[in-house]
Amino acid sequence: MEKEEMIKKMVSILADEFEVEQEAIQPEANIKETMHLDSLSLVDMVGLVNEEFGVEIKTPDLPSLKTFADLYDYVYTRM
């Protein structure tokens, strides 16, 4: 899967699952603020990404995933 295709799929999935406008999910936007995530919702997001893309996001890596660009790069390099 090409990176742009992966990003489009991820944006669509996250927007639908967390009821956020796709336009709000910009590469440099803060994930927690944009999606209004608390710690439980963050766990849900990680599980969803793991399931949809077959990439395990490791707990120690979570603090480094601040923006959607960080998340895209993390997932794409591990696919």
Language model region names:
Residues 2-35, 45-46, 51-79:
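Phosphopantetheine-dependent thiolation modules in NRPS/PKS and related acyl-activating systems
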Residues 38:
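Conserved ATP-binding motifs of the histidine kinase catalytic
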Residues 41:
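Two-component histidine kinase catalytic core, primarily the HATPase_c
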